[in-house]
From Swiss-Prot:
The protein's name: Lariat debranching enzyme
Biased composition regions of type Polar residues, renumbered to the chain: 416-426, 450-483
Family: Belongs to the lariat debranching enzyme family.
Annotated source species: Mus musculus (Mouse)
Modified-residue entries (N6-acetyllysine), positions: 128
Compartments in which it is found: Nucleus
Length: 550
């Protein structure tokens, strides 16, 4: 089947589907499935904008709300994962995945589904070592800390995925697996993104958690985004059986949805012709969810996953034939994902913009139904109960704060390299911290009742026309799923045949009209930069430490 893969979407669904339609007309047939690698931005209304980790002036409504309201419908089944710039309150409603709009499916914090016999897995968010071993404790209203930590990958999601034994065909992650750049054209990558050089040479660019999953799952395809550059690699895994050759993983990262950027690629993927043409639950994955239900943690404390070290009575949560049969019985022997999308929040109305927004922690009926059918815990219900207990003990709700990130030597993450302190800056991005310092008077912790001047949410009609024209300039480029590396000893063969067609889009003049985002591998310095305040003379007597951003 023909599968389209998109990099960072940034809410530009109209442009992506328009580009896809043009690719279909110029290509060799209709596309069966669209996979999006994060920064999807399923923004329904102004409250959702408030929960997206970008500076206020870069918050734009974009076009998802039209698909949420039913005004438009996705022309092709769309599956996506979360990145580091999302409507976090919306996605939090669906920790196990679900429909965010008709024909648009979110994989959840981590998840695996099947479509036409193809097994598709993914993990949302990005890696940040000091949050990796925490539970999922965040909930709206977010503050300046939790609005970021909520999209950081947690060890429990990686642990669940590592229980899988059956082959995974396609896997999605937002940030790249660490070291994957050594298996592609590293020289060309550094020519395009020279500011990656230090991390590439030190092997610190990318996610060690994703790298661990790549080594364990060894999928046929791995797609990522996040770094805003197209890059392909071919990784040869070591054989586990002497009589069989090691598996190969074709890696492809794509750019963001902007004119003249390689943000979309169409591939031919083998599938099972006898498999149903609708989305199905993956029984092995559901079995793992049931087995690991007792491991759910909704606190900010650091904790380790069970392992075979003599300290745990159980460390193997993989599925067995018997436990998978139990899951099939709970599904009534029908693994079809129900089309049970329901609106849980008001949709943005351009004619009636809301200046007052209220951030609410919602329980989504899709998640309620899913958990009831499988007999597992709704994480959001668990979080709400924890807050109620806190309210009962303290007599009042307290402002949610960062529960502390200081660690002792023995409590450190198993990944001792934190990319947050790296100094390289992507000039294609905007540093969130810098912008927050610059907008010091405007920024405040996200609150349940907050005034908000909604940014311009729709382009002017002439701008929209220009953008439509620019995004229609598509060319089929030579495939880069197979590339020659500058490291000859580790390079994939360059003589492979064509595997896909790249879709690029057009006019460079509109680049400045799109919101930028920071690079988050994450390049947040541990000690934030000190800046000069706008009216420095007024603050001449203030201690120097007060002039730095908090």
């Amino acid at each position: 089947m023909r599968v389209a893969v998109a990099g960072c979407c940034h809410g530009e669904l109209d442009k992506i589907y328009e580009t896809l339609a043009l690719a279909e007309r110029r290509g060799s047939g209709p596309v069966d499935l669209l996979l999006c690698c994060g920064d999807f931005q399923a923004v329904r209304n102004e409250a959702d904008l408030r929960c997206m980790a970008v500076p206020p002036k870069y918050r734009h409504m974009q076009t998802f709300y039209r698909y949420y309201s039913g005004e438009k419908k996705a022309p092709v089944l769309t599956i996506f994962i979360g990145g580091n710039h999302e409507a976090s309150n919306h996605l939090q409603e669906l920790p196990y995945g679900g429909w965010v709009a008709p024909n648009i499916y979110y994989l959840g914090l981590a998840g695996v589904v099947k479509y036409r016999g193809v097994r598709i897995g993914g993990i949302s968010g990005i890696f940040k070592s000091h949050d990796y071993r925490k539970g999922h404790f965040e909930c709206p209203p977010y503050n300046s800390s939790t609005i970021r930590s909520i999209y950081h990958v947690r060890n429990i999601e990686v642990y669940k995925l590592k229980q899988l034994k059956q082959p995974v065909h396609i896997f999605l992650s937002h940030d790249w697996p660490r070291n994957i750049y050594h298996y592609g054209n590293k020289k060309q990558l550094l020519k395009t993104k020279s500011f990656f050089r230090q991390e590439v040479e030190n092997s610190t660019l990318g996610s060690p958690a994703a790298s661990e999953l790549l080594e364990h799952l060894q999928p046929a395809y791995w797609f990522s985004a996040h770094l805003h550059v197209k890059f392909a690699a071919l990784m040869q895994h070591q054989a586990t059986d002497k009589d069989q050759a090691g598996k190969e993983t074709k890696f492809l990262a794509l750019d963001k949805c902007l004119p003249h950027r390689d943000f979309l690629q169409v591939l031919e993927i083998e599938h099972d012709p006898s498999a149903p043409e609708y989305l199905e639950y993956d029984v092995e994955w559901l079995t793992v969810l049931r087995a690991t239900d007792d491991l759910i943690n909704v606190t900010g404390g650091l904790w380790n996953m069970p392992e075979d070290n003599g300290l745990h009575t159980r460390w193997d949560y993989s599925a067995t034939e018997e436990t998978m049969k139990e899951v099939m019985e709970k599904l009534n022997h029908d693994p079809k994902v129900p089309c049970n999308f329901t609106m849980t929040a008001a949709c943005y109305d351009p004619s009636k913009p809301q200046t007052q927004v209220k951030l609410v922690h919602r329980i989504n009926p899709q998640t309620t139904e899913f958990c009831a059918q499988l007999g597992i815990t709704d994480i959001n219900v668990m979080i709400q109960k924890a807050r109620e207990e806190e309210h009962h003990q303290c007599g009042e709700y307290e402002q949610q704060g960062d529960p502390g990130t200081e660690e002792s030597e023995e409590d450190r993450s198993e990944y001792n390299t934190d990319t947050s302190a790296l100094s390289s800056i992507n000039p294609d991005e905007i540093m969130l911290d810098e912008e927050e310092e610059e907008e010091e008077e405007e920024e405040e912790a996200v609150s349940a009742h907050s005034d908000m001047n909604t940014p311009s949410v729709e382009p002017a009609s002439d701008q929209a026309s220009d953008l439509s024209t620019s995004f229609s300039d598509i060319r089929n480029l030579p495939s880069s799923m197979f590339v020659s590396s500058d490291d000859a000893s580790r390079s994939p063969a360059s003589g492979e045949g064509k595997c896909g067609e790249t879709v690029e889009s057009g006019d460079e003049k509109d680049l400045a009209k799109f919101p930028l985002k920071r690079l988050s591998d994450e390049h947040e310095p541990e000690q934030r930069k000190k800046i000069k305040r706008r009216n420095q003379a007024i603050y001449a007597a203030v201690d120097d430490g007060d002039a730095s951003a908090e």
